[in-house]
Design a protein with these regions (language model features):
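Domain-exit/linker segments immediately C-terminal to small folded modules
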Residues: 233-278
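General "foldedness" signal
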Residues: 24, 225, 266-270
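Short recognition patches in nucleic-acid-associated and regulatory proteins
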Residues: 207-208, 215-243
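N-terminal alpha-helical interaction blocks
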Residues: 1-209
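Hydrophobic, Leu/Ile/Phe/Ala-enriched alpha-helical segments that form helix-helix packing faces
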Residues: 197-201, 214, 218, 260, ...
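A broad, low-specificity signal marking well-ordered, structured residues that form hydrophobic/aromatic
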Residues: 200, 209-211, 251, 275
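Short cysteine-rich clusters marking metal-coordination/redox-active sites
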Residues: 211-215, 253-256
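N-terminal start-of-chain detector that recognizes signal peptides
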Residues: 181-184, 223-226, 248
């Protein structure tokens, strides 16, 4: 099956570019073709797209994360000579930095998910380091925490990316829903953005409602609003308006909803500001 999407307003276009970049990084561009302003997508491109999305985010933004900062401390800690006069001060500096990162709210929520599959407790280790006198033991325990972070890169690195990059553009749904912040990030993305597409494409859609972006019919129960998009969307259920004659028409089909989730990869982000040339 093939999906066709046309270039539209700047934000949707940035989402299309972001979607393209996900497929590019996943080496799936063979499933995409172009005809003037139309992007044609083979639905095979959506298989395991949730994993492709997460990996694209990691590849694009990993270098600018607290996770990366912590990981880069590994060689520094390993090279501290405990016989040096400054050794204790150096270890204390690295300890404070890693402790600060681990005690952030986003990392604590990540731990709540990870502890279901990994019984190592980094917070217990942090307390042990605080009480430890032996410098070699302090080093070893710090390196244990870094090894733990490396094992769970997808969770911790993505936590940084979610709150410093993705949240610039959208919020309150999927893994940014306040009730899902302790859940598996990949599965939350799949559940909110991909499973509705499978259901939508599996049946013949006939409806009085049409998607505001692609114009395809979409049932009210299968549609999505735009309130989750930062500074753009309006929650039509909470705010009626004479502007649309009290009948909301800002409705998205599941496919276009997915495209908007890719907006953070369509922009170039510098100093918490997004840049996109339409």
């Amino acid at each position: 099956m093939q999906i066709q999407l046309r270039l539209n307003d700047f934000l949707f276009n940035s989402g299309m570019l972001g979607f393209y970049r996900v497929l590019e990084k996943a080496e799936k561009l063979s499933f995409v073709s172009f005809d003037n302003n139309c992007m044609k997508i083979d639905t095979k491109a959506l298989e395991e797209f949730q994993k492709d999305y997460i990996q694209a985010m990691l590849l694009e933004y990993e270098e600018d994360t607290k996770w990366k900062t912590a990981i880069e401390k590994e060689s520094i800690i390993q090279n501290i000579n405990v016989e040096e006069q400054e050794a204790e001060e150096k270890i204390e500096t690295e300890y404070k930095m890693i402790k600060k990162i681990m005690e952030s709210a986003s990392y604590k929520s990540g731990y709540e998910f990870i502890k279901q599959i990994d019984n190592y407790d980094p917070y217990d280790e942090i307390e042990k380091i605080k009480k430890e006198i032996n410098l070699n033991q302090k080093k070893e325990k710090l390196l244990n925490i870094i090894s733990y972070l490396k094992r769970h890169k997808e969770t911790y690195c993505m936590k940084d990316i979610i709150y410093t990059k993705i949240r610039l553009f959208w919020e309150n749904v999927s893994f940014l829903n306040k009730n899902a912040n302790k859940s598996d990030i990949t599965q939350e993305y799949k559940k909110y953005f991909l499973e509705p597409i499978q259901k939508y494409l599996s049946k013949d859609n006939k409806s009085d409602y049409t998607c505001i972006e692609c114009g395809n019919p979409v049932g009210k129960s299968e549609s999505f609003g735009m309130a989750w998009l930062k500074d753009v969307g309006v929650d039509g259920k909470k705010k009626t308006s004479v502007f649309w004659n009290y009948t909301e028409d800002a409705i998205l089909c599941p496919v276009c909803n997915l495209i908007y989730s890719c907006v953070p990869l369509g922009f170039t982000i510098c100093e918490n500001q997004g840049i996109f040339i339409n």
